[in-house]
UniProtKB/Swiss-Prot annotation:
Cofactor: Mg(2+)
Reactions catalysed according to its record: diphosphate + H2O = 2 phosphate + H(+)
EC number: 3.6.1.1
GO MF annotation, one: magnesium ion binding
Protein family: Belongs to the PPase family.
Binding site for Mg(2+) 1: D66, D71, D103
GO biological process entries: phosphate-containing compound metabolic process
Predominant location category: cytoplasm
Positions bound to substrate: K30, R44, Y56, Y142
Protein keywords: Cytoplasm, Hydrolase, Magnesium, Metal-binding
Protein name as annotated: Inorganic pyrophosphatase
Organism, scientific name: Agrobacterium fabrum (strain C58 / ATCC 33970)
Binding annotation for Mg(2+) 2: D71
Length: 177
């Protein structure tokens, strides 16, 4: 896969593309896309036997404060094939920090052309509270048993903050990527 050939989206930050690395409900394995080779590699086996609460990936042509493309958790119930590209719209962001520094997770839903299931979801607050708690629980604990790793949760922010972080990550990629 040539990652450089995949667009950010049709209208960022409102409409973005995500390259999926880990499927919802998959085995406790963290995959990452090798951006240079365009290949999906095994980053690590999670020490904690937990599954991802959504399809997880990144927005191409972005750069977060941690030096990686901006992370996205897609709220949907069907597992996507790692390496596929899905068009989504952001609905919020979970602020967190880990042993590597700031590590925000953009929360998104599939674009309306893919499914009508999320037509009324415009902000993270439109999701069921249990869904948000499950996401928080996963990211708060998925590194618990890994030596030297830690996570600190900073709470949820709305869609406007998510879009601002996406724009900043796009600009950072243009100047530093």
């Amino acid at each position: 896969m040539r990652i450089d050939a995949i667009s950010i989206g049709k209208n960022p930050p409102d409409d973005i593309n995500v390259i999926v690395e880990v499927p919802v409900g998959g085995h406790p394995i963290k995959y990452e896309m090798d951006k240079d080779a365009g290949a999906l590699i095994v980053d690590r086996f999670l020490y904690t036997p937990m599954t991802y609460p959504g399809n997880y990936g990144f927005v191409p042509h972005t750069l977060s404060d941690d030096g990686d493309p901006i992370d996205v958790l897609i709220c949907n119930t069907r597992p996507l094939v790692p390496g596929c590209v899905i068009n989504v719209r952001p609905i919020g962001v979970m602020i967190m920090e880990d042993d590597g520094g700031k590590d925000e997770k953009i929360l998104a839903v599939p674009a309306p052309k893919l499914t009508q299931r999320y037509d009324k979801v415009h902000n993270y607050t439109d999701l069921p509270e249990i869904t948000l708690k499950q996401i928080e629980h996963f990211f708060e604990h998925y590194k618990d048993l890994e030596p030297g790793k830690w996570v600190k949760m900073g709470g949820w922010q709305d869609v406007d903050v998510a879009k601002k972080l996406i724009v900043e990550a796009i600009e950072r990629y243009k100047t530093q990527g």
